[in-house]
Amino acid sequence: MKKTTWFAGRFPGYVSPLSSVALSVLAALCPLTSRGESYFNPAFLSADTASVADLSRFEKGNHQPPGIYRVDIWRNDEFVATQDIRFEAGAVGTGDKSGGLMPCFTPEWIKRLGVNTAAFPVSDKGVDTTCIHLPEKIPGAEVAFDFASMRLNISLPQASLLNSARGYIPPEEWDEGIPAALINYSFTGSRGTDSDSYFLSLLSGLNYGPWRLRNNGAWNYSKGDGYHSQRWNNIGTWVQRAIIPLKSELVMGDSNTGNDVFDSVGFRGARLYSSDNMYPDSLQGYAPTVRGIARTAAKLTIRQNGYVIYQSYVSPGAFAITDLNPTSSSGDLEVTVDEKDGSQQRYTVPYSTVPLLQREGRVKYDLVAGDFRSGNSQQSSPFFFQGTVIAGLPAGLTAYGGTQLADRYRAVVVGAGRNLGDWGAVSVDVTHARSQLADDSTHQGQSLRFLYAKSLNNYGTNFQLLGYRYSTRGFYTLDDVAYRSMEGYDYEYDSDGRRHKVPVAQSYHNLRYSKKGRFQVNISQNLGDYGSLYLSGSQQNYWNTADTNTWYQLGYASGWQGISYSLSWSWSESVGSSGADRILAFNMSVPFSVLTGRRYARDTILDRTYATFNANRNRDGDNSWQTGVGGTLLEGRNLSYSVTQGRSSSNGYSGSASASWQATYGTLGVGYNYDRDQHDYNWQLSGGVVGHADGITFSQPLGDTNVLIKAPGAKGVRIENQTGVKTDWRGYAVMPYATVYRYNRVALDTNTMDNHTDVENNVSSVVPTEGALVRAAFDTRIGVRAIITARLGGRPLPFGAIVRETASGITSMVGDDGQIYLSGLPLKGELFIQWGEGKNARCIAPYALAEDSLKQAITIASATCIRPAS
């Protein structure tokens, strides 16, 4: 006797939801495990067994119908991709835990999974390669298809894989992107009592295949009583592409050298270097953070090699800049904080990587040839060559070296690093250089560098970077040799706050004071529930003078029941300055939900509104304080605001108000500041423009690598985990700041779709190469959502019959009483319905919906099914 088993199924392809009645029936018919043979008793579903479709395909326990399913593919517990995979019916065999469905893989897909096809051939002559069963080709391989969650788990023995590093993504999955034109812009300005100033930054480019053409420029304008000045700076133009077989990048034009072995310098020429980004996350990673303390609402400017690479307005108190463009984060960063009262802080943040350790067997190289390039008007452009190599050796050792060659300069460096286990990691190197300076004097000397990094996990201490460099009296760098004179200033002109245009020294050099010792430190200490401490700083001293360039910042931060507070102290001094700048600052932020006693409210306007207080004291004994209110508004938290009022013992009362809106087509910020002597307005407008084969799309500020989202007709749909990003009126959007050579999840928020928009699958994944604009396309259906009751000869169609709209290909299934739920349906068309084999088990149901169906959430209609002529 056959054992009756209940049924729950899902048809292959993209099956639209059923009517509520049909869904409740299907949800109840859950499969039960049984040793006996199973079959479906149609009499249970209807007394008239002829009114039930042929359900024999579900009589194999938990077997599902073969076809194409969109599944999440996991290999050895690592996510690979979300893709359409074809499944065929087959007997359950060794390694097959998919319930009778056999996933079909092509040789290309098997390579994508990282299988070593040379050791494990997967295709034979004369054998169908469109459906390869992994367990049959690879001993120990297993596949398991979880139909309920649409997850395909693949287990492969490590011996069968080309690369066992965690996070490895085969180059076959890397996407070079689509042809495109890109513009990234940022426009900031201020209008005050005495002067106006504007700053426009433009990064434009073209993408074609693997090639990226970029130009970076900036325009400065200032105007005061009786003067005005403007200047356009061409910061750089370059062409770049990936050399995938070499895991390298080629750059031609204006760029910077690496800073692994030598200090970074600008050049105009060509560079070929190993790309860390092409390797898994476990093999690389470090980025600089610029910290400081602003006493007032200040303008923050960061320069590198004489060029302005970052400019923004910061609130009083401690700040940390973590979003510098990675392509501009090599070499020392010159930080300028222009305070509201006219005072200025200047200090240098050195940037050096952690010790240069490489895995055993890995070789990293960097070759550069070109003219030295700097934004400093005091320097020339000598031609030079630079080559470095870093090699991972056994026993945790790394050896490295390199050379710099120019007409008036020769340098060679050798060094080694080692992993000390529980003691951290260390590297030591020595550089010998022979230099001819601007006065034609010849010098030679050595420089010894020591770097150390260590995380004391048991104590919460992290020595992110601890370094020291000692140089003999005759040691000079390529940057020193490029100066045209032995000493001098590089000037820019600005307002002195009293309606006069005055020169402002941006940098000073004196080659008679060669660098001697340089110490840098970056330490953090986690105190658990009691907060954290950090110490960052550097000190550079020189031969023949007691002056130093020194900057230190010590800070403590903690929180309690939603309240956050911090105390920080900074000390800075530059060569030629009148004295050291010292600032002590305290900051506190309290959510309104705490002030009102609703401490644990979740995502309400009270949680998003903060009362703030900050106070600071400088070296002159000037005390100042500010209180304010700030927070975020709108559903997506993309409108932020701040209002403050304060007082200074030297400058009286002051205040500010600012707001920033992160919109779909860009970011807009406005602000107002005043004090006893002046007031000013400032604003910032930034965004991106992308031209592609389907038109032009406006966006928020672009990153180096971006994703173009294509969902035709799906307007106003939000992108998950992207503040303020949603599709435009055509269904296009740009997701900025994609991670290169990594899986990027792109998901449409289906809750923001209108009643007539559906998407086959709202999630896609892409793996872009450096600088690419990759397309994430979604198959959208724009049309009517309808429940159509179809009848044949006056009787409902059989339950479980397959339905397909002939023009659009939309599929569904007949539910209870002949009801069919369909979405994305054209106003007029035909439904092809089949419930068994033979011409008598199919029919065609023409339908026509009213125009006002487009205004309804769901339309109810009926149709008569007609058997096709033989």
Swiss-Prot record:
Keyword Hydrolase included in the entry's annotation: no
Family annotation (PROSITE patterns): FIMBRIAL_USHER
GO CC annotations on file: cell outer membrane
InterPro entries: Fimb_usher, Fimbrial_membr_usher_CS, FimD_plug_dom, PapC-like_C, PapC-like_C_sf, PapC_N, PapC_N_sf
Classification via Pfam families: PapC_C, PapC_N, Usher
Record flagged with keyword Transmembrane: yes
Signal peptide start-end: 1-27
Keywords assigned: Cell outer membrane, Disulfide bond, Fimbrium biogenesis, Membrane, Signal, Transmembrane, Transmembrane beta strand, Transport
Membrane topology: Multi-pass membrane protein
Entry GO MF terms: fimbrial usher porin activity
Compartments reported by the entry: Cell outer membrane
One Gene Ontology term from the biological process aspect of the record: pilus assembly
Disulfide bonding pattern of the chain: C843-C865
Function text: Involved in the export and assembly of FimA fimbrial subunits across the outer membrane.
PANTHER family according to UniProt: OUTER MEMBRANE USHER PROTEIN, OUTER MEMBRANE USHER PROTEIN SFMD
UniProt similarity note: Belongs to the fimbrial export usher family.
Protein's name according to its UniProt entry: Outer membrane usher protein FimD
Taxonomic source organism: Salmonella typhimurium (strain LT2 / SGSC1412 / ATCC 700720)
Gene for this chain: fimD
